[in-house]
Curated annotation (Swiss-Prot):
Keywords: Capsid protein, Inner capsid protein, Virion
Keyword Membrane included in the entry's annotation: no
Top-rank lineage group of the source organism: Viruses
Subcellular location: Virion
Function field: The VP2 protein is one of the two proteins (with VP5) which constitute the virus particle outer capsid. It is the major target of the host immunogenic response.
Leader sequence residues: none
UniProt-recorded name of the protein: Outer capsid protein VP2
Gene name as annotated: Segment-2
Length: 1051
C-alpha cells in the first residue's frame, strides 16, 4: 500500500484532468454555501443547505419538532459519528448503537471517487479511505448579554397582558416577577461573558426520553355532541344535566386532533398503509385502554391479522393527490369511461344503437369489455335488462320495509333513492364502473378465503368511504368481523382484538353505524355508558362560548402518614398470591397482573376521561351525570405518604388565545405546570400533557423567547427553581432538567443511610437549596447519580460501564463491583433490601433504553405488615415513553422504624435474591430507532442557530498498519477551531494507537500528528493547485479492510 496520502485543493473539477485523480481526497469550491451573520449569530445562507449529498438535511424551513419526531428516514447519509471505530479499538467489541445511518453520497464514476457536499464545498474521497468519514458540527457561543436580552421583553409582554381585565392575571404577574427576581439573582453570580455550554448529548438523550419540556393537566371538556342545560360556573359536575345532540355525519373523534400520539399514528397509517409495523403500532396504542375489554380469550394472531390486511387493503382506493383531494378511483374511472361515450342525457333511459358512425367506437369498447372481463354490458342485451329488474325489485322491497317511505340504498357502489326509476344512462354508467372496479380489484386481491365477508360488498362499501385513514381503520374492524362474527368486543385488555377496537373507536367513535350503512354488517357493540369527553390541550380549538369540564391536579404536602411505616390494608390479597407463586418458581410474565390489582383504592389515572359518566336519563330526557370522584375534594391515597390529587372543574371562558408561530395557544392555569423531573414523580402524570420545548425551524432561526419557554420558566418557579442564564436556553433547559433529576433521585435513595427519612414534599421543598449540577453528557449524569447513591468514589470509564450494564452477560458483575450494592445484596436486614429498588433506576434510566410495551410491568419491593413483598409497577404508566411516574411514587414509603433492622426470613431472602437476578438479567431494547438515529448533528445545528452560530466540519480517520492498529485523524473545514476538534475527537486522539491530528482549513495547515505533512503545488494542464501531502514514514497507509477485520475479531 502507498505510504503517502494526497489532499488536493482546487476550484473545481475540470475535464481531462485525470492526473489529479491520483489524489486521495479532492476539495473543491463548487457548491460552497455563503456565510451569513445576523445579530451576532454566525450561520449560512440556509436555503442553500437543503438536500446536499452526504448530509441528512432536508428543507431548512422544517420545524425542529418535525425534524426530530416525524422525519422517519434520511435518504442516506454517511455516518454522523462512527462510534464502532472507537468501540473496536478501545473495547475490542462491536456495540449495537443507534447512531449509525444510511449513506446518501454519490459515486462519481468518472474519477472513481465518492462525492459529498459539506457546506464548504464539494469533496471527493477514494473509496478505500471513505468508510470512516463523518460530519461534525460545532455550535458557537454568543455574548451572555445577548442571551439575557429576552428577560425585559418577556416581562413587558406579561405586564401588558396583566393590564387587561381578566381573572387570574394578578397571580401570573406575581409568579413572573418571582421568576424575574430569581433570574437576576442567578446573573449576579454568573461570571462568564459568553455562553458556557453547548453540548448536544444531554438534549439529545432527554429528547429521546421525551423529557425536554414540562407537563400540565389535560382539560377533559364536554364533547360537542352534548348541549349543557343546567351547567353553570357554580354547579358541581355531579349536578350537570345534558342534552344529546342529533347524530350527524360520522366524523373523526373530537379528541383526535388533541391527541399527539393518536394523530401521529393516523398520519403513519395514511402514509404507510397497514404494514405489520403499523398493525403493531395500532395494537400498542389501543392496549393502554379498556373501555371495551372483558375476559374473552383472543386467538387472532398478528400473522393472521397481517394476512387479512394484505387482502383487505386491495379494496382500498386511495385518493389521487395529483388530481385533487376529491378525485377517488371511482371518479377517475367514471370520468374516463364517459369521455368515450357519445353525448347523452344522463337522466333519461339508457337507449342507444350502433347506427351512427359516432357510436361505433363506443360499441367497440363494449365489445372489448366483454372479451376481457366476460361480462356483457351492452345496454340492448339481456344482462342489463336483468340487472334493471333485479335492482327495481331490491328498491321496492327496501321501500316497503321503510313503511313505504323513500330511502337511500346502495346500488352499484352509489346511493340511490328508492323512489327513482332505475335504468337511466347515469345508472348504466355506475353499473359499468362498478363492474370495472370489481374486475380490477379481483386481479389485485391476494388469495384469501373470507369466512363472512363478500368481495362485492367490500368493494362497494370501500368506494363510499371518504379518506384513506377511514378505509384502513375499517379494514381492521372487518378483519375482526370475518374472524369472530358480530361479537368483536369483550376481549382481554391488551389483546390484539381489544387493542384494535380501542384504537378505531377513538379515531371514529361512530364507526358501528358507518360499517352497518356501507357494508350491511351489524356489529354487537354496546353503547358507551361514559359521557363523551374530549381531551383538550393548549393547542386545541375551543368554542367562543363557554365550555366546561374538569382536570386532574396533584402535588405533595406533609400530612399524618409517615415515611417510616409499612404498607397496610391498601394492599390487596393479590400481593400475597403473587408472593406465593414466585416462591413456587413461577415465571414473572406468567403470574404478574395489572399493577392496580395489587391495591384496594382507586386512583383513576388510567382512564381519566371516564371519572364522570352517564347515569341514565331523567324524565325530561336529560343525561344525568354521576362520578367516581367528588369534584374539589383532595384525596390522599394510602399508597403514598405526601402525595395528593383531586379533580377540579374548569371553564374555558377565561382562556386567552395567543399567536405563536401561526398557531393558537391557550393560556392554561400556570400554577399546574410542572417540569418533567417533578411531574414524573406523580402517578397522575399520565393525565397531564407533555409540552416539548422543540421550538422554531430545524436550522437557521434564532428563537429568543416563546410562550412554551415562558411556561417552562413558570413551571420551574412553581417549585422555587431557576435555570442558568449564562448559556443558550436549550442547554440551560437540558441542564436544569438533569440537575433536578439528579438531586431528587439522590435525596430519595440516600434517605435511609443518611437517616433523614424525608417525604417527597420535604425533598421538593429543598430543591431551592440543592447544588446546581452540570453534566456534559447524559452518561456523566447517569454515572454521577449511580456513584452518589452507592457512595462510590472510583474513577470509572463512562463508555465501558454503560456498555456493560446494558449487556445482560456482564451486568451482574458490574453491579456487584459496587461495594454498597454488594452489601445490600448480601445483607439480611429489611432496610437494606428495600434499597435494592434503586436497581429500577439503574436499569430503566440508562441511555437509549426502551422496554417492550407488552412487558411493561416489572417488580418493586415493598414492606407490608406481613413482611417483604413485591408488587408490579408500570414503567410506561400510560405515557408515550419509559417513565418514572409508574414506580417512583411507591418508594416514598419505606418501612416501619422497628422493622428497619429486622432480619429477613428464608422466604424473604429468596425473594430478594430473585429480585436482584431479575434486574441483573432483564433484556433491554434500544430507543429512538430509526427516527432519532441520525439527528445528533441536526440538533447541534439547531442549538448553534439559537446561540452564536454553527461551523461545519468533515472528519476522516485513516487506518495505518504498524505493530498495533493505528489511526490518523484529519479534520476539514473552512474556519477550523482546532481546540474544539481535539476535544471532540479525544476518544480517538487519546488512544495509544493514535497518530495525532491533521487540520486542513482552506489552504491552511495545522499538523499535530506524528507524521510529516507538506503544503505543495500540483500543476495540471495550465492550472496550479495546492496539494497537502502526508508522508507515512515508517507507517503504511491502508489495509483498506482494517476496520472490517477489527470488527470481525470483536464480534
Amino acid at each position: 500500500m502507498a505510504s503517502e496520502f494526497g489532499i488536493l485543493i482546487c476550484d473545481k473539477l475540470k475535464e481531462n484532468t485525470l492526473e489529479k485523480t491520483n489524489c486521495d481526497v479532492i476539495i473543491t469550491g463548487v457548491g460552497k454555501v455563503g456565510v451569513h451573520e445576523e445579530d451576532g449569530v454566525l450561520g449560512y445562507e440556509w436555503e442553500e443547505t437543503n438536500y446536499r449529498l452526504g448530509l441528512c438535511e432536508i428543507e431548512n424551513t422544517m420545524s425542529i419538532s418535525d425534524f426530530v419526531y416525524k422525519q422517519i428516514r434520511c435518504e442516506g447519509a454517511y455516518p454522523i459519528l462512527p462510534h464502532y471505530v472507537t468501540d473496536v479499538i478501545k473495547y475490542g467489541m462491536v456495540i449495537h448503537r443507534n447512531d449509525h445511518q444510511i449513506r446518501v453520497d454519490r459515486d462519481e464514476k468518472s474519477i472513481g471517487k465518492i462525492q459529498i457536499q459539506p457546506y464548504f464545498g464539494d469533496m471527493y474521497f477514494s473509496p478505500e479511505y471513505y468508510p470512516a468519514t463523518f460530519i461534525k458540527r460545532e455550535s458557537l457561543p454568543i455574548s451572555v448579554d445577548t442571551i439575557r436580552g429576552y428577560i425585559g421583553a418577556r416581562m413587558r409582554g406579561i405586564e401588558a397582558r396583566a393590564g387587561r381585565i381578566r381573572e387570574g392575571d394578578g397571580n401570573l404577574l406575581e409568579c413572573a416577577r418571582r421568576w424575574e427576581k430569581a433570574a437576576y439573582e442567578r446573573i449576579e453570580n454568573e461570571k462568564a461573558l459568553r455562553c458556557v455550554a453547548h453540548e448536544t448529548d444531554p438534549t439529545y438523550q432527554i429528547l429521546k426520553k421525551q423529557r425536554f419540556g414540562f407537563v400540565y393537566p389535560h382539560y377533559y371538556v364536554l364533547n360537542t355532541n352534548y348541549n349543557p342545560t343546567t351547567v353553570t360556573r357554580t354547579s358541581r359536575i355531579n349536578d350537570w344535566l345534558l342534552k344529546e345532540k342529533t347524530q350527524g355525519v360520522v366524523k373523526t373523534a373530537e379528541a383526535f386532533s388533541d391527541n399527539a400520539e393518536l394523530k401521529t399514528l393516523a398520519e403513519r397509517m395514511e402514509e404507510e398503509e397497514l404494514t405489520e409495523d403499523i398493525i403493531r403500532a395500532v395494537i400498542r396504542y389501543g392496549a393502554k385502554y379498556a373501555t371495551r375489554s372483558g375476559m374473552r380469550e383472543d386467538t387472532l394472531s398478528l400473522q393472521e391479522l397481517d394476512r387479512y390486511c394484505d387482502s383487505l387493503t386491495t379494496f382500498v382506493h386511495k385518493k389521487k393527490k395529483d388530481e385533487g383531494d376529491d378525485e377517488t378511483a371511482r371518479t377517475i374511472i367514471r370520468n374516463q369511461w364517459i369521455k368515450g361515450m357519445p353525448r347523452m342525457d344522463f337522466k333519461k333511459e339508457m337507449k342507444i344503437t350502433r347506427g351512427p358512425i359516432a357510436n361505433w367506437s363506443f360499441f367497440m369498447s363494449i365489445d372489448a369489455f366483454k372479451r376481457n372481463n366476460k361480462v356483457d354490458i351492452n345496454p340492448n342485451h339481456q344482462t342489463w335488462k336483468d340487472h334493471i329488474k333485479e335492482v327495481t325489485d331490491q328498491m321496492n322491497r327496501a321501500q316497503q320495509g321503510n313503511n313505504n317511505k323513500p330511502l337511500k340504498v346502495q346500488i352499484d357502489g352509489v346511493s340511490i333513492l328508492t323512489s327513482e326509476k332505475y335504468g337511466t344512462v347515469g345508472h348504466w354508467v355506475d353499473w359499468v364502473v362498478d363492474l370495472i372496479m370489481l374486475a380490477q380489484v379481483k386481479m389485485l386481491i391476494k388469495e384469501y378465503k373470507f369466512k363472512r365477508l363478500n368481495s362485492q360488498n367490500l368493494m362497494s362499501g370501500m368506494n363510499k368511504l371518504v379518506g384513506a385513514l377511514r378505509c384502513y381503520a375499517y379494514c381492521l374492524i372487518l378483519a375482526l368481523y370475518d374472524y369472530y362474527g358480530q361479537d368483536i368486543e369483550g376481549f382481554k385488555k391488551g389483546s390484539n382484538s381489544s387493542a384494535i377496537l380501542e384504537t378505531v373507536i377513538q379515531m371514529f367513535p361512530n364507526f358501528k353505524q358507518e360499517i352497518q350503512a356501507n357494508f350491511g354488517i351489524n356489529l354487537n357493540i354496546k353503547d358507551k355508558k361514559t359521557i363523551a369527553i374530549r381531551r383538550a390541550t393548549m393547542h386545541s380549538d375551543f368554542s367562543s362560548n363557554e365550555e366546561y369540564g374538569y382536570k386532574f391536579v396533584f402535588g405533595w404536602a406533609a400530612r399524618g402518614e409517615e415515611v417510616l411505616s409499612n404498607y397496610g390494608d391498601v394492599l390487596s390479597d393479590e400481593v400475597e398470591e403473587l408472593f406465593t407463586k414466585l416462591r413456587k418458581k413461577e415465571h414473572w410474565d406468567k403470574v404478574v397482573e395489572d399493577p392496580e390489582s395489587y391495591f384496594i383504592d382507586e386512583l383513576y389515572q388510567k382512564n381519566p376521561a371516564e371519572v364522570f359518566y352517564s347515569a341514565g336519563y331523567d324524565t325530561d330526557q336529560n343525561v344525568v351525570i354521576d362520578g367516581k370522584m367528588t369534584e374539589g375534594v383532595t384525596y390522599f391515597s394510602k399508597r403514598f405518604v405526601s402525595y395528593w390529587y383531586r379533580v377540579e372543574k374548569i371553564t374555558t371562558k377565561h382562556l386567552e388565545f395567543l399567536t405563536e408561530e401561526n398557531r393558537k395557544v391557550a393560556q392554561f392555569d400556570f400554577e399546574d405546570y410542572k417540569p418533567m423531573a417533578i411531574g414524573e414523580m406523580g402517578i397522575h402524570a399520565s393525565t397531564y400533557k407533555y409540552e416539548s420545548l422543540l421550538l422554531g425551524k430545524n436550522r437557521g432561526q434564532k428563537v429568543n423567547d416563546s410562550i412554551a419557554l415562558c411556561n417552562y420558566d413558570l413551571a420551574l418557579t412553581n417549585f422555587g427553581v431557576s435555570r442558568r442564564q449564562d448559556c443558550c436556553w436549550i442547554s440551560s433547559c437540558s441542564a436544569i432538567e438533569l440537575s433536578m433529576r439528579a438531586n431528587i433521585i439522590i435525596a430519595i435513595f440516600r434517605r435511609i443511610e443518611d437517616k433523614r427519612y424525608e417525604n417527597f414534599a420535604k425533598i421538593l421543598s429543598g430543591l431551592t437549596q440543592q447544588q446546581d449540577l452540570y453534566f456534559p453528557t447524559y452518561k456523566h449524569y447517569y454515572l454521577f447519580v449511580l456513584q452518589k447513591v452507592l457512595r462510590d468514589e472510583r474513577r470509572i470509564d463512562l463508555n465501558r460501564i454503560c456498555t456493560e450494564l446494558f449487556d445482560t452477560q456482564r451486568r451482574r458483575g458490574i453491579l456487584l463491583s459496587f461495594t454498597a450494592l454488594r452489601f445490600w445484596n448480601d445483607s439480611e436486614f429489611l432496610g437494606d433490601a428495600l434499597m435494592m429498588n434503586f436497581l429500577h433506576r439503574v436499569v430503566f434510566e440508562m441511555e437509549n433504553v426502551d422496554v417492550d410495551y407488552g412487558k411493561k410491568w416489572h417488580p418493586l419491593l415493598v414492606s407490608s405488615e406481613k413482611g417483604l413483598r413485591v408488587i408490579a409497577v408500570d414503567v410506561f404508566n400510560s405515557m408515550m415513553g419509559v417513565s418514572t411516574s409508574g414506580w417512583l411514587p411507591y418508594v416514598e414509603r419505606i418501612c416501619s422504624e422497628s422493622d428497619m433492622r429486622r432480619r429477613l426470613n428464608a422466604d424473604e431472602l429468596e425473594l430478594k435474591r430473585w429480585f436482584f437476578d431479575y434486574y441483573a438479567t432483564l433484556p433491554l431494547e434500544r430507543r429512538g430507532e430509526p427516527r432519532l438515529s441520525f439527528k445528533y448533528e441536526g440538533l447541534t445545528t439547531w442549538i448553534g442557530s439559537n446561540c452564536g452560530g454553527v461551523r461545519d466540519y468533515v472528519v476522516q480517520l485513516l487506518p495505518m498498519r504498524k505493530s498495533k492498529p493505528g489511526l490518523l485523524c484529519i479534520a476539514y473545514g473552512d474556519d477550523v477551531n482546532v481546540q474544539w476538534v481535539e476535544h471532540e475527537l479525544r476518544d480517538f486522539l487519546m488512544h495509544e494507537g493514535s497518530l495525532g491530528l491533521v487540520v486542513i482549513s482552506g489552504k491552511m495547515l495545522v499538523n499535530k500528528s506524528k507524521l510529516r505533512v507538506r503544503n505543495l503545488k500540483i500543476y495540471n494542464r495550465g492550472t496550479l493547485d495546492s496539494l497537502f501531502l502526508i508522508s507515512g514514514g515508517n507507517y503504511t497507509f491502508g489495509n483498506k479492510f482494517l476496520l472490517s477485520k477489527l470488527m470481525a475479531k470483536a464480534e
